[in-house]
Design a protein with these regions (language model features):
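Active-site region of glycoside hydrolase catalytic domains
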Residues: 1-124, 128-192
Length: 192
């Protein structure tokens, strides 16, 4: 997004890396004008979107460590690290995005693969965070549900084809599709 928003200029961490990977100065200068800025930023945030890289690999038995060639670390869900919790969630990320880019935002995916009650709680949490940030001045245009009609095999990121159906706001296993608790909660929020 920095590249499209015209922020990758001399001194930006990606500038030298892109130049070393064959991006020409003219190409980067053209992008630096900001003319490729998107009109709206699509913002996806899941409970496990925020990650924590910890060099103390011994604290995470059973978690396979990773490496960048210089450092050994584990990549865990930040939400599982208690001391980070006050800094986590959709609100702080929406605020960061708005403050960094000043481009209108649409929260384009709100979903949590779990019980209906937890899905409603998560949707309400994201909706409330968007409303809070809107009141603080962020231009947040929309909060959308994902997936409206559910997904097949998405929990494996389509790496397996086992026909697992996860219900969305509407359950398509009935005709016509039946609104779920999440759809009803979203309709109530929309009405205010």
């Amino acid at each position: 997004l920095d590249l499209l928003a015209g922020r990758v200029v001399e001194g930006h961490p990606f500038h030298r890396w892109l130049r070393n990977k064959a991006a020409s100065k003219a190409q980067l200068d053209e992008l630096a004008t900001g003319e490729a800025r998107p009109d709206v930023i699509g913002f996806d945030h899941y409970l496990t979107s925020e990650r924590f890289l910890d060099h103390r690999v011994g604290r995470y038995p059973g978690v396979e460590p990773g490496s960048n060639g210089r450092h050994l670390y584990v990549d865990v869900e930040a939400t599982r690290v208690d001391r980070l919790k006050p800094q986590l969630g959709p609100g702080p990320r929406l605020r960061e995005t708005w403050e960094r880019y000043g481009i209108p935002i649409a929260v384009t995916e709100v979903h949590h693969g779990c019980t209906r009650e937890e899905q409603v709680r998560w949707f309400h949490e994201v909706w409330s965070a968007a409303e809070r940030e809107r009141r603080r001045g962020a231009d947040i245009r929309a909060v959308t549900m994902w997936a409206m009609f559910g997904t097949v095999d998405w929990r494996s990121l389509l790496t397996r084809r086992d026909g697992t159906y996860d219900v969305g706001a509407f359950d398509t296993r009935s005709e016509p599709p039946r609104p779920t608790l999440v759809a009803k909660a979203a309709a109530r929020l929309r009405r205010g």
